[in-house]
Amino acid sequence: GLETKFYEDFQKNDLEDVLKIDKIKIINFWASWCLPCEVEHPILMGLSKKSDFIIIGVNYKDTEEGSAEFLNEKGNPYDLVVIDDEGMMGIEMGLTGVPETFVVNEEGKIIYRIVGPINNENKF
């Protein structure tokens, strides 16, 4: 996959750059303090082996230590990690809580949204 990049301070134009990537994007909002995020994590790890989309992890209202520890322990499925400690990107995307996942097409339009943990019924 791509190198995982960490955007430390989320800027609106970072999101615009990401949305312009000419691939299907799975944008997954998660946090180390979120128990259902742990439940869905193995599914994300499985998805990360496919190459027809990129997976963007938005670490939501979390600490850097917490998020790093979570990914070190459980594996990192993300091509790109955005640190959204203020919740700005969540506001931009109309987040209702974590975990929440948006599927965004090549043109940058949200085509699918999963509120709550991803499960094996979700088709990617």
Language-model region placement:
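Conserved segment of the thioredoxin-like fold in thiol-based oxidoreductases
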Residues: 49-86, 98
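Conserved redox-active cysteine motifs that mediate thiol-disulfide chemistry
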Residues: 29-46
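Hydrophobic beta-strand anchors of alpha/beta hydrolase catalytic cores
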Residues: 26-27, 55, 101
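Solvent-exposed loop/turn segments at secondary-structure junctions
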Residues: 31-35, 61-65, 87-89, 117-118
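Short pre-active-site segment immediately N-terminal to redox-active cysteine/selenocysteine motifs
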Residues: 23-25, 30-33, 97
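Thiol/disulfide oxidoreductase modules built on the thioredoxin-like
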Residues: 72-77, 84-124
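A short beta-strand-turn-helix
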Residues: 1-25
